[in-house]
């Protein structure tokens, strides 16, 4: 079969499959101090460090999730709870569903976010959480994330970026993004389904409010 839908879900790469199988064979609670727990912790933190190195970020500021949907929801829950919300008109349903009362940022004729309109919305709602995808999952349109981040910073707003579509295909470098948080997904990059991460600016990683409360691990 000739598979032509990799931008929706990329087939599992052999290296990712081998890594996943190796992790599944590790029986241990990463929070335990016995040998099996330490081995599991090593696997977990090695993966975090590898991801951080790839995106030029700090390992301690990366939270693993079940995918970009959860990463987007976590960012909106944790960063937007006490802020007005602004989301792009063409955002993924995962963002739209997590922020039902958000103001809508229109797009231009070419499908990119209207950054003049963003400045206007932030003049009325300073300090908002703005959610903007780096690359549209249906059209492939690329937004100017750096410019959007600059506008947000000028108005005391935070920017959350859904990079599920762009991170595997473009040279995505955390140092040039200027966002408070970025969501990524494993299955868009040849990884297993059910794997993703939320990358956070250091100021927002510590004390992140969880979606679900439970044990410390």
What positions do the PLM features span?
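Pyridoxal 5′-phosphate
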Residues: 1-217
